[in-house]
Amino acid sequence: MANPKNEKRLKNRFLVWFGGTFGPSLLRFFYNTNKWEFKDRYHFKDAVSSGRPIIIASWHNALLTVFMGLSKNNYYGLAGNHHPDAEIISRIGAKLGWKVVRGSSTDGGKKAYNEILEILRSKDAVFAITPDGPQGPAKIPKPGAIRAAQRTGAIIVPVAGQSSKRWGFTNWDTFYLAKPFGTITLMFGKPLSFSEESSFEDCSNALKKSLDQLEERVNQHVGLVSDN
């Protein structure tokens, strides 16, 4: 009789191999066959011009759009630690030009957080984080990005993205994958700065409000009813 644990382990190994090997080419096809629009990118350029480190924040459901729209820039990104999907993201990210830090709030979080702080102490660092990832709850910021910004003086630039043609996969959120031959819009929001004296509740509310409003705008732009 087959051992279910061994079967799951073999399945996970196959998925990691398949995703890491073919994922970059598949994502390039899905996303590079779309027309791209970048809205209000001056917000990001202004943040870069400030000389301070930057945290790019987006909801988890838009991860792939932000991931592909900002690839090839040698930016940093955060993936989970020991989950197969995190390993796939890490391998794909490396091939697409991202420098991936492994860890999450529940798995290797302290080590990853300290590494993020070290990276953000470099003034030219750009680090992408999904504040509600990797396991939700959806659209509720966890402390990591906010605390890191407070500790290092990093500017948080909210970003939302959506495609006019897409698939949606519902789990704890609705995770979007662009279909080929549509139009993808990546929209940047007004940068946020949080002092160390600011309460987490106030910072969290400000970040959530910004990301929710940005998501609603980009969804309206591509003709998608917001799932807020």
Model-derived features: positions:
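Non-catalytic C-terminal accessory region of glycerolipid acyltransferases
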Residues: 2-28, 45, 71-75, 95, ...
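A short, well-structured juxtamembrane/interface segment
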Residues: 28-53, 62-65
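Short, flexible loop segments at the rims of nucleotide/cofactor-binding pockets, characterized by
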Residues: 31-36, 55, 103-108, 134-135
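Generic structural signal for residues in well-ordered beta-strands
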Residues: 36-38, 100, 186
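Conserved beta-strand termini and adjacent loop/short-helix elements that scaffold enzyme active sites
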Residues: 39-41, 80, 103-106, 189, ...
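Short, well-ordered turn and helix-capping elements at secondary-structure junctions
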Residues: 40-42, 60, 104, 133, ...
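Catalytic core of membrane glycerolipid acyltransferases/transacylases, capturing the structured
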Residues: 52-107
